[in-house]
Regions:
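A beta-strand/beta-hairpin structural motif
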Residues: 56-82
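Contiguous beta-strand segments within globular domains
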Residues: 7-25, 30
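N-terminal "mature-chain" segments and other terminal, solvent-exposed stretches
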Residues: 1-5
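Intrinsically disordered, low-complexity segments enriched in serine, threonine, and glycine
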Residues: 51, 66, 79-81, 86, ...
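Short helix-loop boundary/capping segments
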Residues: 23-62
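Surface-exposed coil/turn segments at beta-strand junctions on protein surfaces, enriched
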Residues: 12, 32, 65-69, 85-87
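Internal, hydrophobic beta-strand segments that form the core of beta-sheet-rich folds
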Residues: 36-46, 84-111
Length: 121
């Protein structure tokens, strides 16, 4: 059972993740009670020999769980270069929320959220 059932494109140079025509209610398996989903990506360069690391996190994109097709672009603010000799790790994070009186609350203290390693180079 996968949380995300949508295709995406990862640009390994910039760390950008692109979803074309994402339909949240059809392509994201949300827990009962969720009204919104947040997506972000992370780009980590880690040099295992020197322990030098650089992490870049994209701004969060928050969407209602509806049937509207939406293009989503998750772009880290900079390239995670570290020393330039490390390993690049690419992550995708999905978090669920419930809207109550126009305030979004995390469901069950984040127990339904997912962080997936999507590529290593």
């Amino acid at each position: 059972n996968s949380v995300l059932k949508a295709q995406y494109h990862l640009n390994v140079t910039t760390g950008e993740v692109l979803f074309t025509d994402l339909i949240p209610v059809q392509q994201i398996s949300a827990p009962t009670g969720a009204t919104h989903v947040s997506l972000s990506c992370e780009f980590l360069n880690l040099d295992l020999e020197t322990d030098v690391k650089a992490l870049q996190i994209s701004p969060v994109t928050n969407l209602p769980l509806n049937s509207l097709a939406t293009n989503v672009t998750l772009t880290p603010p900079a390239t995670a270069t570290g020393t330039g000799t490390g390993i690049n790790f690419y992550f995708l994070k999905i978090a669920f929320f419930q809207d109550f009186n126009e305030i979004q609350y995390t469901l069950n203290n984040g127990a339904y959220n997912a962080l997936q390693l999507i590529e290593i180079i």
